[in-house]
UniProtKB/Swiss-Prot annotation:
Residues 1-22 are annotated as: Disordered. It comes from the Eukaryota. The gene is KCTD4. Pfam families: BTB_2, KCTD4_C. GO terms for biological process: protein homooligomerization. This is BTB/POZ domain-containing protein KCTD4. SMART domains: BTB. Coiled coil: none annotated. Gene3D superfamilies: Potassium Channel Kv1.1, Chain A.
Length: 259
């Protein structure tokens, strides 16, 4: 009886060790198929087969030792590229197609990433997407900065990109907030209008006033230059033929931007 029990215990012990070895081997195999990449400070963990999906590309070259790549302090491959945009590069490798969130506006930057990683398919899809966007007519939107008591005082900004109008509106609010301790009720915002309680005229031009004690926020000229600089940085063109009727953009009551 004891002999049979001991034999069973030995068999169970052997099976347990065998299973442990199998689990350990599976764990090693799993780890060996994974890679951690540090792209511009962002860590991505993916399978090697994902990175080698397309031959003769930058990532395939790293995995197969064709391309030498530096390591970060933790021993991960370091690639000095845009860490946020790499998410879309990796999703392209996983899905075999370009899937971008609604409102994505960084086509040119993503095209540069595709070129760096030598992904011709991704580059072609980005180019195709950008060309379709250029052909799609955009509805002109506007932002009005106005005096509550005198609608003739103020500035209108017209643009064919609604998201850019939102950027300008946020920037104007930020500029105004930075010059005030609080955010007064006299400053009201709607979908397309920023309305101040009073404007005043001074030797230096029209100023935006939010309080009865004439708290200075900024001049309309300052806001015009803010809008123009933002537009140029975002790749818009200023339609000067529309805006220079008064001799100078600074004296114009409307700015028109187009892409």
């Amino acid at each position: 009886m004891e002999h049979k029990i001991n034999r069973r215990e030995k068999e169970k012990d052997y099976e347990g060790k065998h299973n442990s070895l199998e689990d350990a081997d599976q764990g090693k195999n799993c780890k060996s198929t994974l890679m951690t990449l540090n792209v511009g400070g962002y860590l991505y963990i993916t399978q090697k087969q994902t990175l080698t999906k397309y031959p003769d590309t930058f990532l395939e070259g790293i995995v197969n030792g064709k391309i030498l790549c530096p390591f970060d302090a933790d021993g991960h491959y370091f690639i000095d590229r845009d860490g946020l945009l790499f998410r879309h590069v990796l999703n392209f490798l996983r899905n075999g197609e370009l899937l971008l969130p609604e409102g994505f506006r960084e086509n040119q930057l993503l095209a540069q990433e595709a070129e760096f990683f030598q992904l011709k398919g991704l580059a072609e899809e980005v180019k195709s997407r950008w060309e379709k966007e250029q052909l799609t007519p955009r509805e002109t939107t506007f932002l009005e900065i106005t005096d509550n008591h005198d609608r003739s005082q103020g500035l209108r900004i017209f643009c064919n990109a609604p998201d850019f109008i939102s950027k300008i509106k946020s920037r104007i609010v930020l500029v105004s907030k930075s010059r005030l301790d609080g955010f007064p009720e006299e400053f009201s915002i709607s979908s397309n209008t920023i309305q101040f309680k009073y404007f005043i005229k001074s030797e230096n031009g029209t100023r935006l006033v939010l309080k009865e004690d004439n708290t200075f926020v900024c001049t309309l000229e300052t806001l015009k230059f803010e809008a123009i600089m933002m537009a140029l940085k975002c790749g818009f063109r200023l339609l000067t033929s529309l805006d220079c009727s008064k001799g100078s953009i600074v004296h114009s009551d409307a700015l028109h931007f187009i892409k």
